[in-house]
């Protein structure tokens, strides 16, 4: 279960039920408000003085109409044409007064008004002085976003749910498709649909800066966006150039399969002639699952109907590599669970660098049970129902291995392009078929590094296969039970380091992430079969998804780590000897960075993601003697919006629970007042190795809750989450839900003791694993601390989730039945002690099946528990998007939370009928 993040990409636009009904008030800037406030006071004084100085000011006697008439005049924008303070009866009443009385009243009123005016002027001057000296008059547009701010400066517009759902707060970001030149040139990128350029161009990254004189000339690969074949027009949505840049593989008519995989029609485009031909000559409309170039640019391997084929360029001949592909046997592409949990990709094919061999995964899921996904509204297959079946839902059967069920059997196969045969290499000591996961495949010259684990991911073997001799051996075996009792996370970042004796590398090797110093650290293994590495990093921090790049010319390894702080990310470099680790990004300031390197590591796209306004720039790296820097994105519009809006005040810190320091962020409403008592919404994900508290810029749903609704929103990353040390991570092994919920409850009790918190209005919410944790926390707390909860697409019993993810943390139900029973959400009586909770789920969720929510509902029914609301979404998967569903999710969360904190749900228990209204009397 990869962390489900309700990022801006996840949110969809729609009707805002909390739209401001007086938009002009919010559109007004602070400067306008300040001007109007000051000028209104002046206008009042000017109006009084104007009337005092004119003949029209003829005060009346002391009858009861005077005050009302004065107020009416001061509030009237239209000047009267008759006597000031006059009305229809003024002449008749004034005729009854004596001239002497009128003059005495005039002087008396004048004296009184001057005294009052003097006092008001003095008060106004003093107030103006204080106002100006405090600089509180400054409009929000004068204050740049300050992530360190602990108070709100000025005033501004409110953050709205519409803005969040419409991605108005999403930082603009760019990605670079780095590509090596035909002769190995570094710093080239692939640009599609550039302004004023051909459709697909290879360009020197330095050409992005108009003032650069070093940039090489760009090369157009595809000039026109559309192409024609057999009198039909096509548009390529995917373009993949060959390494020699002479051909481009095009994909049209792309249709998604699962999270990463898709089907498409493929074409070969010739750069020189700008002509196209179908990849499958005899079947122009053939829909393929995968196609990939040989590194030598002379062949393409593809998968169709789960069988693999090879086409050599310059020939229409198709060579069939496998013949056993079927609905249950996959070649070169993963099945559902391997795509979702192991490869995080639709690709299970790997070319050797010399183009002589193809390694591929063969997956046999014959023994894997099926799970039906029902579609009641749509027909994702695109097929029309058979006559008489129009009123039945479409059902898609997925081979889905739940915890403890049969796993797919995987084997790594090799195809020898020259010999034309498929072979495998048997290695002694391998895991049994139903106890084997193949998690990573890396070519190392003529050899292949293969990582495999047992099915519960606590024993790993690194296997080295020589495809020339067709032999292999295990070069490293690690039992994590002997280290800390945890598990191995899957990684695809192992980097092959070829030998270069002249450059100080006598043997081939590889850089990998291993368990060291209570965390994940980088290690360099050389030669390939050496089980003892050179440690490149060590200490009380961790590397993140490392390494990022390797500079083979200068023996430098680049990586991202938490060295400065567990909630920050900075980029570093270190030599392959483990010496001279230095930062690439500015560590003197807080920062959360991501980085993308060119193929030769001489250039990089640096992405600053927070805590201030995000920006991006391309730089030359320490590997490049020619200095270069170009700002790609500054997000000026976002910075301007941040100035004009009242954003939440984000307070970061740690809370100590059972001797463990846990990171938190508390989002406070603008103009936070410590003398008030605020409701609190706890938002969390809490999944193993995940992280939600981090120093990034984000205006998301949680920000809206704080800045738009005026509640406090807290996130605490409890034990089991990432980057707080393996000791605090692996404590959850075999017992999911216990420590995570314990930490959320402890945090809630801590906040409940704060003077500015309303302890009777605490709620918690989450999606996916966060939904599970919401329910588990409510169950464990039983209404003592949390009163409300909102769970979206939750797991409720880990026996219902997929085997590879679940067993990594829980082992199998056969060996840990007590742990599975404890981890399930089953205590309906405890849930009944909460005031109320909300449950939402997509009916067509292929990841966390609807079975989870339905089973919980049945348990609640059996105990006659009714303090909950349910909303299901037909045909929606785990993201819940179908037919405006995502918008409704967040509308529902908002409305439900407001009702909860307003006490509406307190009125539901033991509801009694109101008295009947009397019928209106009939009219005559």
UniProtKB/Swiss-Prot annotation:
Transmembrane segments: 112-132
Positions of region (Disordered): 1-104
E.C. no: 3.4.14.5
Annotated Gene3D superfamilies: alpha/beta hydrolase (3.40.50.1820), Dipeptidylpeptidase IV, N-terminal domain (2.140.10.30)
GO biological process terms on file: proteolysis
Membrane topology: Single-pass type II membrane protein
Stretches with biased composition (Basic and acidic residues): 9-23, 47-58, 92-104
Enzyme class, first EC level, given as a word: hydrolase
Cytoplasmic topological segments: 1-111
Regions of compositional bias (Polar residues) in chain numbering: 31-43
Glycosylation sites: 231, 364, 827
Vacuolar topological domain residue ranges: 133-924
Gene Ontology molecular function terms on file: aminopeptidase activity; dipeptidyl-peptidase activity; serine-type endopeptidase activity
UniProt feature coiled coil, ranges: none
PROSITE patterns, alphabetized: PRO_ENDOPEP_SER
Pfam families assigned to the protein according to its UniProt record, in alphabetical order: DPPIV_N (PF00930), Peptidase_S9 (PF00326)
Keywords associated with the record: Aminopeptidase, Glycoprotein, Hydrolase, Membrane, Protease, Serine protease, Signal-anchor, Transmembrane, Transmembrane helix, Vacuole
Catalytic residues as annotated in Swiss-Prot or TrEMBL: 768, 845, 878
Protein task: Type IV dipeptidyl-peptidase which removes N-terminal dipeptides sequentially from polypeptides having unsubstituted N-termini provided that the penultimate residue is proline.
Family: Belongs to the peptidase S9B family.
Name of protein: Probable dipeptidyl-aminopeptidase B
Natural source organism: Sordaria macrospora (strain ATCC MYA-333 / DSM 997 / K(L3346) / K-hell)
């Amino acid at each position: 279960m990869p962390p489900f993040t309700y990022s801006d990409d996840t949110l969809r636009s729609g009707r805002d039920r909390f739209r401001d009904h007086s938009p002009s008030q919010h559109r007004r800037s602070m400067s306008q408000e300040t001007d109007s406030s000051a000028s209104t006071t002046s206008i009042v004084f000017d109006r009084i003085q104007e009337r005092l100085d004119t003949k029209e000011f003829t005060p009346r006697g002391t009858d009861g109409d005077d005050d009302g008439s004065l107020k009416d005049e001061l509030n009237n924008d239209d000047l009267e044409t008759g006597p000031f303070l006059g009305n229809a009866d003024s002449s008749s009443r004034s005729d009854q007064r004596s001239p002497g009385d009128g003059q005495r009243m005039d002087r008396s009123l004048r004296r009184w008004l001057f005294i009052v005016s003097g006092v008001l002027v003095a008060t106004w001057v003093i107030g103006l002085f204080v106002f100006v000296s405090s600089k509180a008059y400054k409009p929000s547009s004068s204050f740049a976003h300050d992530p360190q701010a602990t108070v709100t400066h000025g005033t501004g517009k409110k953050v709205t749910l519409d803005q969040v759902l419409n991605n108005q707060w999403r930082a603009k970001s760019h990605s670079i498709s780095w590509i090596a030149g035909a002769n190995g040139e570094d710093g080239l990128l692939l640009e599609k649909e550039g302004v004023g350029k051909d459709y697909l161009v290879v360009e020197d990254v330095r050409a992005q800066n108009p003032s650069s004189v070093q940039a090489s000339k760009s090369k157009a690969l595809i000039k026109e966006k559309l192409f024609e074949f057999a009198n039909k027009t096509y548009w390529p949505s995917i373009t993949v150039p060959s390494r020699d840049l002479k051909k481009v593989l095009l994909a049209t008519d792309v249709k998604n399969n699962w999270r990463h995989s898709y089907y498409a029609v493929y074409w070969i485009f010739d750069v020189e002639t700008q002509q196209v031909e179908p990849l499958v000559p005899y079947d122009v409309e053939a829909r393929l699952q995968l196609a990939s170039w040989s590194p030598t640019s002379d062949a393409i391997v593809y998968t169709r109907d789960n069988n693999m084929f090879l086409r050599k360029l310059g020939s229409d001949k198709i060579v069939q590599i496998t013949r056993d592909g079927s609905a249950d046997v996959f070649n070169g592409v993963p099945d559902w669970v391997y795509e979702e949990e192991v490869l995080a990709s639709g690709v299970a094919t790997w070319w050797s660098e010399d183009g002589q061999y193809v390694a591929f995964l063969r997956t046999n899921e014959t023994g894997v049970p099926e799970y039906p996904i029902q579609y009641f509204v749509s027909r994702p297959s695109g097929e029309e129902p058979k006559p008489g079946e129009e009123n039945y839902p479409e059902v898609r059967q997925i081979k889905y291995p739940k915890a403890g069920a049969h796993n797919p059997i995987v084997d790594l196969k090799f195809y020898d392009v020259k010999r034309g045969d498929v072979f495998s290499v048997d290695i002694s000591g391998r895991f049994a078929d139903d106890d084997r996961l193949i998690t990573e495949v890396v070519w190392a010259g003529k050899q292949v590094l293969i990582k495999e684990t047992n099915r519960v991911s606590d024993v790993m073997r690194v296997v080295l296969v020589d495809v020339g001799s067709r032999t292999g051996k295990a070069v490293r075996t690690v039992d994590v039970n002997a280290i800390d009792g945890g598990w191995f996370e899957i990684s695809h970042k192992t980097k092959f380091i070829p030998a270069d004796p002249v450059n100080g590398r006598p043997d081939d090797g590889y850089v990998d992430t291993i368990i060291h110093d209570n965390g994940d650290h980088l290690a360099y293994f050389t030669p390939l079969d050496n089980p003892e590495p050179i440690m490149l990093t060590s200490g009380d921090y961790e590397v993140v998804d490392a390494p990022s790049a390797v500079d083979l010319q200068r023996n430098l390894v680049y990586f991202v780590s938490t060295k400065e702080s567990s909630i920050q990310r900075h980029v570093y470099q270190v030599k392959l000897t483990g010496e001279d680790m230095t930062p690439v990004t500015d560590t003197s300031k807080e920062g959360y960075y991501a980085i993308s390197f060119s193929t030769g590591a001489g250039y990089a796209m640096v992405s600053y993601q927070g805590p201030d306004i995000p920006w991006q720039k391309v730089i030359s790296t320490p590997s490049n003697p020619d200095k270069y820097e170009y700002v790609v994105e500054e997000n000026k519009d976002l910075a301007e919006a941040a100035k004009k809006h009242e954003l939440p005040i984000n307070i970061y810190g740690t809370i100590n629970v059972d001797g463990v320091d846990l990171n938190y962020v508390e989002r406070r409403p603008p103009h936070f007042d410590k003398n008030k008592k605020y409701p609190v919404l706890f938002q969390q994900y809490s999944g193993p190795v995940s992280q939600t508290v981090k120093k990034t810029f984000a205006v998301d749903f949680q920000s809206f809750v704080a800045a738009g609704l005026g509640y406090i929103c807290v996130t605490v990353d409890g034990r089991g989450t990432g980057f707080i040390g393996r000791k605090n991570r692996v404590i959850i092994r075999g017992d999911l839900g216990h420590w995570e919920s314990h930490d959320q409850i402890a945090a809630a009790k801590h906040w409940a003791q704060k003077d500015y918190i309303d302890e009777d209005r605490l709620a918690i919410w989450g999606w996916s694993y966060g939904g599970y944790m919401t329910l588990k926390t409510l169950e464990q707390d039983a209404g003592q601390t949390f009163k409300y909860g909102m769970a979206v697409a939750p797991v409720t019993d880990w026996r219902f989730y997929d085997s590879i993810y679940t067993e990594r943390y829980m082992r199998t139900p056969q060996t840990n039945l007590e742990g599975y029973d404890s981890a399930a959400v089953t205590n309906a009586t405890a849930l009944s002690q909460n005031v109320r909770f909300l449950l939402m789920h997509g009916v067509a969720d292929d990841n966390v099946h609807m079975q989870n929510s339905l089973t919980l509902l049945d348990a609640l029914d059996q105990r006659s528990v009714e303090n909950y609301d349910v909303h299901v979404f037909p045909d929606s998967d785990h993201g819940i998007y179908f037919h405006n569903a995502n918008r409704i999710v967040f509308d529902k969360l908002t409305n439900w939370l407001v009702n909860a904190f307003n006490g509406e749900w307190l009125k539901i228990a033991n509801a009694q009928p109101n008295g009947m209204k009397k019928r209106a009397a009939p009219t005559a």
